[in-house]
């Protein structure tokens, strides 16, 4: 059964879209990532114009992150205070990212910068996560005790001034690194057209040492706010939000996210981190392969502006 | 039956108002408006044409080339080159006001119908359509062998929006022809131009044009116009709908 998408201006199979929503929703609920870095390329593959894909995915991400945030809020796993501090940096970062996006597009190298950023970010984060979680699993397998966090063992950047206590996350750290992380996520998110959850979760876990589940829950809350802002921004500036596409995706996505959230809680934290690390690494490799392999056609055609 | 009725009617029309001075044509489309609704997956339109043979001394047109052009858009064609192991866009060419949809339907392969010069002048055949490029500060069409031009045609053909069918025009009687114009589901919305040219012994004889419209209606149109005219409202409504769906799913699946 096909459905015509009024803004994307093409017919697609409704079941393909639903399945896509459920699969990506499952992953986003499980790992607390928005899923944009998976969904956007898949939609473009289906023939949806990139501008419409990026804008419409934000509606799907808003819906599934809201659903996930509610679940985590009820389980009291969201660190609202940490989320708000991250947001102050995040919103400034988004603005800087939008400006960088415009400058790079003017010089015609936006695609390349996006691809290289993807490869570097995903490759680094994926490798770090996989290595760390494998070490943790190995320790457990050998029956060794995990390192207990000692209060005095904070790295230098957490010992900077303006310290703040985040009770939910059980950390007492300087706000400077928190705001900086928020800024970086906002910047990369705007530049790469993603929610940034898959970068934020490891950053919270490894840099700020927030417990895994709290990191996931707080990242979901952040995704919710940034994606709701993104819907409005895209709708007003580009008119590229396809409500029909978004609705089908979000119905599948929210259902998938519910199961994903449960699956995420059923798994031990180390295994969850290993899986997310592998996923991030796989997407990074995929982008790298695309850039290195000789393309089928050395020429590509894009529609100028017109915001179609 | 409707397919037969149309050419018969046209024949009557031609006989009634015959002007023998030049070979005239009467054209008719099975519908002049393609409407896009939620189950739209593409459509086909049938074009009927009747050629008035004119005075017996004149050669009867032997060939027909139908060209359908969708609304114009500007495109950029990029060329990639390997740089430090990565494929990078190194060069680009702007195609200004190129048709977003281009169908060439002919009674036989265009190169058999007339000389390359004539075809080029008449813009008959996929390779002979004028595609204006911006080269530096100049605007011009280039030779058909230009790699950017060929790449542009190749990509558009792969997208199913450009095509040439050498057997797309069929004569159902000596002076009556029929052409089927496929409109794919991804066809852009807007005004389309149908140009029919007839040839006899390699020279153009007559030409006729029709217009065709592809438009969204009902729900599709409502959504598209709302997004255009009330972007704030549309954005807010979409955002609220998203939150609503998220909330409902959360409540529906609540277990604790």
Where are these regions (language model features)?
Chain B
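Sec/Tat signal peptide C-region and signal peptidase I cleavage site
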Residues: 18-22
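Short solvent-exposed capping/turn motifs at the termini of beta-strands
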Residues: 51-54
């Amino acid at each position: 059964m096909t459905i015509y998408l009024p803004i994307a201006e093409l017919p697609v199979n409704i079941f393909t879209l639903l399945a896509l929503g459920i699969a990506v929703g499952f992953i986003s609920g499980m790992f607390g990532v928005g899923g944009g870095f998976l969904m956007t390329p898949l939609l473009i593959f289906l023939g949806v114009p990139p501008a419409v894909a990026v804008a419409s995915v934000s509606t799907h991400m808003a819906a599934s992150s809201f659903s996930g945030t509610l679940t985590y809020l009820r389980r009291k796993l969201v660190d609202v205070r940490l989320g708000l501090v991250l947001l102050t940096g995040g919103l400034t970062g988004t603005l800087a990212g939008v400006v960088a996006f415009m400058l790079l597009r003017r010089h015609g190298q936006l695609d390349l910068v996006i691809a290289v950023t993807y490869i570097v970010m995903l490759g680094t984060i994926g490798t770090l996560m996989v290595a760390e979680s494998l070490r943790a699993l190995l320790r457990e397998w050998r029956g060794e005790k995990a390192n207990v966090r000692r209060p005095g063992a904070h790295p230098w950047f957490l010992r900077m001034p303006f310290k703040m206590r985040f009770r939910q996350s059980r950390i007492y750290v300087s706000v400077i690194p928190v705001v900086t992380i928020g800024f970086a996520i906002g910047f990369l998110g705007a530049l790469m057209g993603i929610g940034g959850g898959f970068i934020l979760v490891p950053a919270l876990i490894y840099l700020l040492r927030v417990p895994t589940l709290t990191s996931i829950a707080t990242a979901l809350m952040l995704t919710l706010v940034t994606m709701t802002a993104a819907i409005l921004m895209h709708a007003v500036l580009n008119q590229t939000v396809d409500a029909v596409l978004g609705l089908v995706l979000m119905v599948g996505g929210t259902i998938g996210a519910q199961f994903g959230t449960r699956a995420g809680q059923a798994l031990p934290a180390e295994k969850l981190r290993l899986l997310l690390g592998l996923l991030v690494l796989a997407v990074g490799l995929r982008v790298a392969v695309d850039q290195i392999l000789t393309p089928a056609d050395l020429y590509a055609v894009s529609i100028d502006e017109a915001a179609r | 039956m409707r397919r037969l009725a149309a050419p018969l009617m046209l024949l009557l029309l031609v006989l009634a108002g015959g002007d023998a001075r030049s070979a005239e044509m009467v054209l008719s489309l099975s519908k002049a408006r393609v409407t896009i609704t939620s189950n739209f997956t593409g459509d086909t339109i049938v074009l009927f044409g009747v050629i008035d043979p004119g005075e017996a001394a004149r050669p009867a047109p032997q060939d027909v080339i139908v060209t359908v052009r969708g609304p114009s858009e500007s495109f950029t064609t990029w060329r990639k080159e390997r740089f430090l192991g990565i494929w990078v866009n190194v060069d680009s060419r702007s195609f200004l006001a190129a048709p977003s949809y281009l169908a060439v339907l002919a009674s036989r392969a265009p190169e058999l119908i007339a000389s390359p010069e004539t075809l080029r002048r008449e813009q008959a055949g996929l390779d002979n359509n004028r595609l204006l490029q911006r080269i530096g500060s100049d605007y011009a069409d280039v030779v058909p062998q230009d790699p950017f031009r060929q790449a542009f045609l190749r990509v558009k053909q792969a997208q199913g929006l450009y095509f040439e069918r050498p057997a797309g025009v069929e004569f159902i009687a000596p002076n009556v022809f029929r052409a089927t114009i496929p409109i794919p589901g991804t066809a852009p919305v807007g005004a389309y131009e149908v140009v029919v040219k007839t040839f006899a012994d390699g020279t153009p004889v007559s030409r006729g044009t029709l217009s065709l419209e592809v438009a969204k209606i009902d729900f599709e149109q409502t959504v598209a116009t709302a997004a255009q005219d009330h972007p704030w409202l549309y954005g807010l409504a979409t955002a609220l709908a998203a939150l609503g769906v998220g909330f409902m799913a959360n409540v529906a699946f609540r277990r604790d």
